[in-house]
Amino acid sequence: MSNVVVMGAQWGDEGKGKIVDLLTRKCDVIVRFQGGNNAGHTVLVGDKQYILHLIPSGILHPGKKCLIGNGVVLDPAVFCREVETLRDKDVDVSPARLMISRKAHVIMPYHKALDVARECHKTNESKIGTTGRGIGPCYEDKMSRIGIRAADLAMPELLRAKIEAALLEKNALLAGLYGGETMTVDAVFDEVMAVAPRVVPHLADVTAEIEAAWAAGQHVMFEGAQGTHLDIDHGTYPFVTSSNTVSGNASAGSGIAPTRLDRIVAIVKAYTTRVGAGPFPTEQLNEAGDYLQQKGHEFGATTGRKRRCGWLDAVVLREAVRLNGPTDIALTKLDVLSGLKELKICTAYEYQGGTITVAPQEQNGMAHVTPVYETMPGWDDDITGCTTWESLPAPTRAYIARIEELTGVRVSLVSVGPERDQTINRGW
């Protein structure tokens, strides 16, 4: 397997965890390149379920090296909890296989406090549905060049000085603007230093580790979080995350040249879901939406929030293709559609008196489109036991073929269930 980027093509929750876990078998190093613990990957291995928020799911494969890149924002306490949980399940999480870029920025207690305070002070119409994990405020400090990086955890004097400088501003915001409680330098410093000794042994030069892997002839996978349409620049702004989720950030977020990337896999759920606020043209607030939500067990791995559900949106997918340039599609949760008499695919939008096939770029423009649907026959068959393309029902194959026609990208992997082996490989 060549060097590959795996990214979500919708609004996150596409099933990246399973596909990453599957493809990990053919690679040696897995790199997480953006986001923080505001995303969750769920992987089912035998009778054990693993939910990972920071650590790449490749850690579940013995002998694979997992790297957290400079584009990630790291909550050290969450990292330590995940390490402990995995260790309790006999997973090797030693620093030799799990490394963190020294350049990764650290989520501080005041970031989380600000995240929650801001959301609480917004009107219902302006709330973006933040997870309250401090992701956005941490990225803000990074861009303002006042952030704390992972390397600082090994330098207590520098860390304390940075905390002291940061709290001059953060306390003014927390107390003066939001009416909240202030934080002391000692309390923040002590909270971070309580976990720092467990994080510091994992610090490394991630770029050098990747280069060393390539020099040894090894294959590297770059694992994205969230989805294309939550991208800070290209998503449904302002209802987006705080990082670039598109494939191009695999390079910047891990410190490698884009010319080293060979394949890009877009993970596409067979229908569409979204968590939290924001436009969702194909959302179904009816029996079809309830069916997808209940059969698909659509609850967020990170927040536990019920996901909004709707029909597949090919306009959204074409935009994802344009932004990411995928070489392959991995189609997930196809089995959830079994039992529906008919399926709908949105192929265009009605917008401002005309028909468009590209998403509008005006702020909240997606909230004012009307989907144009194409209807296809569904199927009653249970496809969870299908292992080949030929064993799938004819309507299922037609649905997949239509996705390929609408996106111009081959569906190379088809997931028909949550288990690792419930995947049809069409020439990956």
Curated annotation (Swiss-Prot):
Residues binding substrate: 301-307
Give the positions the UniProt entry annotates as the active site: 13 (proton acceptor), 41 (proton donor)
Assembly description: Homodimer.
Catalytic activity field: IMP + L-aspartate + GTP = N(6)-(1,2-dicarboxyethyl)-AMP + GDP + phosphate + 2 H(+)
Per UniProt, Mg(2+) binds at: 13, 40
Q: Which UniProt keywords apply?
A: Cytoplasm, GTP-binding, Ligase, Magnesium, Metal-binding, Nucleotide-binding, Purine biosynthesis
- Record keyword Transferase present: no
Residues where IMP binds: 13-16, 38-41, 131, 145, 226, 241, 305
Record CDD domains: AdSS
Which family, according to the similarity comment?
Belongs to the adenylosuccinate synthetase family.
Q: What is this protein called?
A: Adenylosuccinate synthetase
Does the record bear Signal in its keywords? no
One Pfam entry for this protein is: Adenylsucc_synt
In terms of InterPro entries, this protein maps to: Adenylosuccin_syn_GTP-bd, Adenylosuccin_syn_Lys_AS, Adenylosuccinate_synth_dom1, Adenylosuccinate_synth_dom2, Adenylosuccinate_synth_dom3, Adenylosuccinate_synthetase, P-loop_NTPase
How does the cofactor bind to this protein, according to its record?
A: Binds 1 Mg(2+) ion per subunit.
- Cofactor(s) required for function per UniProt: Mg(2+)
Domain of life where this protein originates = Bacteria
Its localization reads:
Cytoplasm
One GO cellular-component annotation of the UniProt record comes to: cytoplasm
Annotated EC: 6.3.4.4
